[in-house]
C-alpha cells in the first residue's frame, strides 16, 4: 500500500520505495483499496460521493424525491368567499378568473367583476366592487390583476378594457380612479408594475396594444397619465403579434441604493424577444430572434439583480432566461453607464415543450412549467433538473373569448391554453386558478422533504437529496433551507443506516477455531477482514461512502461517536476502524478525536501493522494529535515517520528525530534487520529534507529562519568532535562519533544527502542569526576538512567520499581552498580504487571534474593508474589536454575493443569514435606545434583506425588531412591488406587530377583490373563515368577485353571517337545478352538487363550515322546489311518464342528492336536514296533472305513493303516483289504502311492496254484494304 500523504521526489536510493503489506492492509485492486475513490462510493449509494463538488444532476426516473417538493391543496378560503359572494348577489354564479399575490396580500378576480381581497397578516377579508359611477357597477369578468411592491395599490383589468385602481391601505379600500386607455372591445391580459415602484403600470390587451400609466401623488391629487407605447419609430416587431399568455410581457426596474437606474420592457412573440427602454424615449436595446421554424411556445423570466459597486464604475448584473419550444437559454445581463449587454451563459434542450418560466425568488432555481402541467425545478448554474412536481388540478381556466382572441391574431390555442393571471407564484406558494376553485401548492422546506422521503422510501434517497441540498446552499432560498436542521436530520439517517448494516458483517466468533489452532490474533483478524472484504464488499463500500459524505457535511465525528459503541457491542468494530483508516490515509478525514486515534492505533498495533501506523499518524492534522500519547507510542514502536511528524510539526524540535536516527544507525551496524533498514532509509529522507529547508515527512517548506536553525543545529551535532548529552551509545574515545555512524555503513547515502544540501542558501552565508545571536555558519570548507581528517586515519576509504569531494570542489571551486597534496590524494584515490563496470563512468566523470580545479598532477603516474584500472575516458581527457597523443589514440583503440560490453561507453558507434579523433583537429590548431604531432600520431595508427570504420576514416581523412594525404596513402601502401581497399574508397571522393598525382598509372591499372575482375562490367562502367579521363590509360582496353567488359568498351570507344568499334561492340553486347536470357522467365534482374539493352539500342542509329559520314554508298550498303541482319537474327530469336506474348518486358524489347531496325532503314535511305544500285542490292538481299528463312519471312516482307512505300518505287523495280506475294496481299500490306494519303494508284501489268500502248485503267488501293479499278 502506498502512502497517501505524498512522498518527496528526492530519493536516497534508487530502489522502489513501495512496501508489500499483509492482506490486512488495502492493496492492489481489492474492493477495500486504500485509494478508495468516489466511484467506489457511488457503487453503493448510487450517487457520486463528491456531490458537493460535482453537483451531479438527478434523473427523474432514478430518484423518488420528485413528488416531495410541493404539497398541494384547495384554497378553501376563496371557495367560501365565492359562496358568500354568490349569496350577496342573489344566487348569481361567480368563479375565480384571475389571481395575484404579494407578501401577505392575496387578491382574486371573479367572473362577476368583483375582487376578493384577503390580508393574511390581519386575517381581513373584503370584496372590492368597482364602479364607473356611484350608481353604475361593472359586471365584466376580471381578467388581470396587479399588486404593487408596497402592497398598497391594487389594479384590476376587465374584459371591456377598463382598469380600476384601488388604495387598499385605506379602511375600507378606496377606488382612486378608472383608466379607459384601451378600447371597449379589448380584453386586458397583463397588468405589470414597474419592479419595486408604485409609480408606473404597464397594461396590454389581447389585440397587442400596450399602454403605460404613470401615477403622481396618488395620496394628494390622484393624478394619472396614460399613453400608448408607439414602436413604429424603433423599427421593432409588430405589436399585434405579441402572444397573449403569462410570459408575453414583463416590466423590470433595477435600483442602486434606492435610486431608479434603469427601466425596460420585455416583449415576447413567437418570432423573437425584444427589450425596450421607455425613458427618456422608447428605444430598442436588444433583440433575439428565434431560429427559423415553427415555434409553438415562448416565454421568459428575469432574476433579481445583483449590485456590484466599484467607485464610479458601478455595474448591475442580472440573469435572464428565455425559452422557445423545448429550448432553454440562460443569459447574464450587465448594465453599465446606461448600456445593456447580454452574454449567453448556457443552453439546454428538454424532451417537452416549455410553457412558462419563473425564477424562484432569492435563489438560483428556475421553475419550468411543461406542456403536460409538470413542474421542473432546475439548477440555474448547470441547467440540470433537481426535482419535479405535478400540478394538483390540470384543468386550468379556459374561456371561449380567450380562444376567439387567440384565433383572431392567428395564434393556435395549443400555444398556451389558459389566461395570463391564472397562475401566480411567491417565495412559499404557487396559486393555480381552474374553472371551479383555486389550487395552492406550498413549497416544502428541505427538512420536511427529507422527513417525507425517509418515511416513504427509506435512507438512501433522503441522504442523497439532503447531501445535495447542503452542498449546494447557494441555489436554494434561505426560506426553504435551514442548514442546521437538515444536517441534524441527515446525521440521524446516517446513524440509522450504519446501525442497520452492523448486523450484516461477520463477528470474530466464526474464527475462534482458527484462533485456537494458531494462537495468533493477527492472523485471525487478517483472515476475518480479508473474508469480509470479499463477501461483503458492497456493505463495506457503503460504510466508506457514508463516511465520505458525512465528512463533507462536517458530521462524521458525531456519527462515529454514536456507531462505535454499537459495532463494539456486536464485535464488529473492525469494520468502522478499517474504514476510518482508509479515510485518514487518503486525506479525506484528517482530524479524528484523540479517543478515535487511540482506537485505530491500538487496533493496528494488535494486528502488528507497524508500517500502517507509521503512515497513518502523519495523515492526521497535527493540531488534532494527542501529542503525549502519539509521542510515547511512536518512540515505543520505533515509528520513525510518526516521530518526525510529531516532533517537527507539533514541537518544532528536530533533535528528537535526529537522536532517533542516530540510534537507528547504531542498531543497523550492530544488529541489522529488515525493519531497521526501512527506518534507516526514512532517516536519510529526513536528513535530506531537513538539510534543504523542508519539513519531513510531508515535505512542507520551513520558513527561512527556522530552516537555518534546523540546518545549523543538525550540522553542529553530526560534525561534533566530542559526544553530546544525547541518549546515543557512541565511543567517547574517538573524534567525530556521530559522523562515524553515518560513514560506517551508509557513506553513499550520507554524501548524496550532503551534496544536495550544499546547494541550499545557508551554505552561501557567512553568518546566521540563531536565538538572537549572530553565529558563523557551518561552511563547506570546514565540513570537507572534518571528513578528510576522519578518513586520513582509516585504511579503507569509500569511493563515494572521493566522488563527493570531486563534485563539490568542482562546483564550488571559488569558495574552497585546499592544498595540492589534498587534491593529489583525492586523485590517487579515484585512480586506484577497484571500480565495478557499472560505476566506472561515475568515477571517470568525478576525475574529470577534479582535474578542472587541480592541474599540477603527475601525468605519467596518473595515466599509468588509469591504464591499470581501464579508465579510458580519463586517459582521453588527460592525454589530449597534456599533448600525450599516443596515449590518446591507444585509449581510443581500447575503447573500441570494449564495444558490445554491458557498460561500454562506445557501444556500437564506430563512426562516432572516428569522428571524435578527427574533430579534435578543429581545436588543436590553437596550440602551436601540436597539430603536427597529433597528425603524425594519427597517421602512425592509420591501419588500426581504418579497421574500426574504413568509410568514416577515409571521409574524415579527405576532409581534415587533405594536405597530408600523401602520408596517409604511403602508410596504407605499407599495409598490403588495405592498400587497394583504401584506393577503392578514395576514388569516389577525389578528382582525377588528385588520383593521378597520388598514384602511378600502373597502380591505377592494377586497381581497375581488380575491379573489372571482381565486380564486373557495371562497376567498371560506373568508375569510367566518374573519371572519364581514365579511358586514355595505356593498356585499359586489354584489361576490358580480357575480362569481357563490353559496356565499358563501348564507353571507351565512344569517348575515343572510335564509333565503328563502338557499334560493333553494341551488336556484340546485344547478341551476348540474348544468348544468356531465359525468355521463359521474367524477374527483376531480367527486367533491368532488358532496360540496359533498350538504352544501347537507342545508340545504334546515332553511331551508324557517325560511322557513315564520309563513306561511299557501297560501303554504307554493306555495313548497313551486316548490322541490320545481325539485329534481325536477334529479332527472329525473339519471334520464335511464343511466350513473349505474355511477357511484357520482352515484348517491349521486341518493339524497341523493331523500331531500331526501321530507324536504321530511314537513316540508310536518307544516305542512298538516289543510288539505284545500292537500293537494288538491299532489295534483292531482303528478298533472298525472306525466301531462304521462313521464320523471318513475315517481318522481312513488311520491311520490304516499307522500303517500297517510302521510296515510291515504280513497277519496274517492284516486279521482283511479286515473287513473294500475290497482288491482293501486296496491296493490302502496302496500304497499311502508307500514312499520308487515303490510297495509292498502282499500274497492273496484267491489265489491257489501249491502241497507243497505254494502260486504260489502274487499281486504286485504299489504306483500309479495299481495292477498286479506276478507269483512266
Curated annotation (Swiss-Prot):
It is found in: Golgi apparatus; Cytoplasm. PANTHER family: VACUOLAR PROTEIN SORTING VPS41, VACUOLAR PROTEIN SORTING-ASSOCIATED PROTEIN 8 HOMOLOG. Keywords: Cytoplasm, Golgi apparatus, Protein transport, Repeat, Transport, WD repeat. Its main location: Golgi. The gene is vps8. It comes from Schizosaccharomyces pombe (strain 972 / ATCC 24843). Transmembrane segments: none annotated. One of its GO terms (molecular function) is zinc ion binding. This is Vacuolar protein sorting-associated protein 8. GO terms for biological process: endosomal vesicle fusion; late endosome to vacuole transport; protein targeting to vacuole. The keyword Repeat applies. Belongs to the VPS8 family. Involved in the retention of proteins to the late-Golgi. Plays an integral role in the complex vacuolar protein sorting process.
